[in-house]
């Protein structure tokens, strides 16, 4: 993997669908708190949304905080007819260019039961992940095992603290380096066996 390029902006990127129960509004609320404490962060933090349209809570937060220059909605990445690069290849490229990837788990009760497929896409990118999860100790452990930033959905203070840590790490050019552990068959089998033998 080539060395990550730190630039003028701290680019937090979310890929995939958004909804009122899986919204970037919670990240914008944390950004507002960050800017109160570190006003200069306002000139550097950018939140990018790729994929689906913004949910209504995210749109409201943009207006409430005046964040039209902070949250940038790019929509779906489509195939480039000139270069022939597919939308999927563009997504992979944008993931690898991100400073931090935002994994929004949602806050439905069924979130406690599943691991989002986006998590695996993010792992392959090799970029730091900021997981905002909902009552899912297994997902939390998978994130922590791979050196990720972690917050609990609904914990505004904790989310703000995580964003502050990301900001301070970025300023030092020392964002967490994820441990490269894509999940393969071997790991799945050993994990299943460890649960059976307990």
Regions found by a protein language model. Name each.
Residues 4-22, 28-31:
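Conserved donor-binding/catalytic core segment of Leloir-type glycosyltransferases
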Residues 22, 78-94, 101-120, 130-141:
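Nucleotide-sugar-dependent
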Residues 153-161, 168-198:
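A charged, aromatic-enriched C-terminal amphipathic alpha-helix characteristic of glycosyltransferases
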Residues 96-97, 124:
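Flexible glycine/serine/alanine-rich "lid" or loop that lines and gates the nucleotide-sugar donor pocket
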Residues 38, 42-44, 48-52, 56-92:
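Nucleotide-activated donor-binding/catalytic signature segment of Leloir-type glycosyltransferases, i.e.
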Residues 25-41:
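Short hydrophobic signal-anchor/transmembrane segments that target glycosyltransferases
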